[in-house]
């Protein structure tokens, strides 16, 4: 038993928090940032992380990221995604270190690293509302006090282009 009263099973498989594409294979990592295993198969329930800068990966070792702050933010994100059972296909780390989440045809711009737990918990309901649509959920104005997110549907070209008769 551990100090928090939960049973610890040393034989238990570690949970995959996310994966990176490395040398043509998917390398899965846990919530502590350790590379667990690599497979050619991508598991649907594990978000693919793109845009992260890191050095060579070694199994069972911590992923050697260029910016530790960005990585701890990523791990905070994957933990919240798992906690609220969100279906996220991809987490894209932008140049500024902030993240875009991609779920089916919806892109979520988290905008900054604030209020992650609240943003992700609210996102579960938002994603249900826009299921089947394509577009962007912008969380630029979202905070604990002002739960505001803007959904911008993706414009389809066929609606914009008027039919021209060639007769």
Q: Where are the regions a protein language model picked out?
A:
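Charged, solvent-exposed interaction patches on well-folded alpha/beta domains
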Residues: 1-167
